[in-house]
Structure formats: C-alpha cells, structure tokens
Regions:
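Hydrophobic/aromatic beta-strand elements that line small-molecule binding cavities or substrate pockets
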Residues: 69-74, 175-177, 200-204, 230-232
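N-terminal leader/targeting segments and the immediate start of mature chains
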Residues: 17-75, 244-249
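Short hydrophobic/aromatic-rich beta-strand segments that constitute the beta-sheet cores
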Residues: 80-85, 104-108, 166, 186-189, ...
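Acidic/charged, solvent-exposed loop-and-adjacent secondary-structure segments enriched in E/D, K/R, S/T
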Residues: 107-146
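Extended beta-strand-rich segments in extracellular/periplasmic secretory proteins, especially
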Residues: 143-210
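Non-transmembrane domains of secretory- and envelope-associated proteins
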Residues: 18-27, 110, 160-163, 191-249
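Sec-dependent bacterial lipoprotein signal peptides
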Residues: 1-16
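N-terminal mature ectodomain segment of secretory-pathway/periplasmic proteins
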Residues: 46-110
Length: 249
C-alpha cells in the first residue's frame, strides 16, 4: 500500500464555535446530545477557499527530529487541495501533493509524480512508518468539515461535562472523536487487523480562523510512538483558489 511522508497535516482542521451575542445560551453541559451535534455541524461550515502555512516536526524513537515548512491551499467548492513542503533552513522544495477528482498526485523535484487513488492513500510517518492512517478518515477535516461518521446512526455518544465523545466502529477500525465547547480536540484511531494506533490532539485556536495553534499526532504499532507536531504560522480565510494553483504534474 502506498504511503506519503511528512503529511500529518491531513488530520486537523477543526472549526470555530459560534455564539450569537443577542441570544442567551444554555451552558453546554445542559444541552442534549442532538443539540450539541447541531452546534458542531454549524460551527464547521467550511470557507470557500483558504490558505495556511505551518511548521512540522517529526520525531522517531531514539533518533533526532526532522523539520519542514508547509503550505496548504484548500478549494472547498471544487474539493481540491494543494500541499507544498520545503526545507526549513534553505527553503528548497521537498515534496508537493495535489488532491482532486478522487486521486492524489504526489511528487518531488527528484521524483516523477505518482497518481494514487484516494481510497488507497495512506498518511504515513517517516522511516519506521508507525504513523499509518487511511486518508479518507481525515478528508472531511481537511476540507473544513466534520466527518460524517460523527453523525452516523451507528455512532455511540457519551458526555463528560463540556466534552462530547463520538465513537464509530466498523469491521476494520474504530474511531473516537472528542469535542469540547463545539471544537474538536482529539481523534483516536485503531486499525483492528494490524493494530495500528494513532491519536491526534489539537490545542489552542489560531486567531480569526478554524485552525488550532498546534496539532500533535502520535502513531504506534506494538512499540514506542512516532510523533509529529504541526504549528500553524499563518492563515488566510479569504484566499483565492484558481485552476492553475492545483496542478497534477
């Protein structure tokens, strides 16, 4: 199965909570699960186009960390995404990726572009590949939406004060989404067959945007976890998305 490197960004685009100044709202603890879900759905309404820059660090057990800078442009109207990763010191392009029309196009200045069906695309870590996630799991988050798994009929819910947990399970995997005050705070994923585990935790709120200030992703398979940390550096929620900005070659 194909894997992509340095792509932990795919697990994080939670939305902002919405409050109307003229309306006195009940404390979140007093809302029903249905009311909380409706507030979450409304809070995650995606922008037509946005652009963000971020720094990413990867840590493997017993090895020194690796760093890269990244940018992402998301066209929600046409379901297109463009990533670029560069060296943090010299600014040299390391890799680039476009997602559109059901395919992932990934390449680098040294390698030809690979075309991979989205259903077969795996968000991976570095050398030991302990971070392994199906891209579909986080696709809606990357487009600025909550995964439909959160609202599915077979999803189970539980609450702890201001926190809401949505647990979805099928034959292959189990996913747990944690929300607090209408914002996603963590996603936990377990693949049953190969015991691949991953957990993404989002902290803080980047000003005037739906992004967290930091996302930490840990992945492990029967051993110490591999870690990736993403720190957001700039966000433009009114960016322009044009055809030329989503090349496939």
């Amino acid at each position: 199965m194909n894997k992509a490197l340095i792509l932990a960004f795919c697990s994080f685009i939670p939305g902002l909570g919405c409050k109307t100044p003229q309306t006195q709202e009940l404390p979140v603890q007093e809302l029903s699960v249905r009311d909380r879900l409706e507030k979450i759905r409304a809070a995650y309404a995606p922008a037509p186009c946005f652009y963000a820059s971020f720094g990413v660090e990867s840590f493997q057990p017993g090895k020194s960390g690796q760093k890269a800078d990244g940018t992402v442009r998301v066209d929600n109207a046409n379901r297109r995404v463009r990533f670029c990763f560069t060296d943090s010191i010299f600014g040299i392009t390391l890799s680039h990726m476009t997602i559109r029309d059901g395919f992932v196009y990934i390449g680098s200045p040294r390698d030809p572009v690979q075309q991979i069906p989205v259903d077969r695309f795996v968000v991976g870590g570095l050398a030991n590949n302990s971070i392994r996630l199906p891209f579909r799991l986080f696709e809606d988050l990357m487009y600025g939406r909550v995964p439909e798994q959160v609202f599915a009929d077979k999803t189970h819910y539980r609450t702890e004060g201001a926190r809401l947990f949505a647990e979805y399970e099928d034959r292959e995997s189990k996913s747990v989404y944690e929300f607090e005050n209408d914002r996603m705070r963590s996603v936990t994923y377990l693949h049953k067959q190969d015991r691949a585990n991953a957990k993404a935790e989002m902290t803080g709120t980047y000003p005037r945007s739906p992004f967290p200030q930091k996302m930490e992703l840990n992945g492990w398979i029967d051993g110490p976890p591999e870690k990736m940390i993403v720190n957001f550096q700039g966000v433009d929620m009114t960016a322009v998305c044009k055809e030329v900005q989503f090349p496939v070659n």
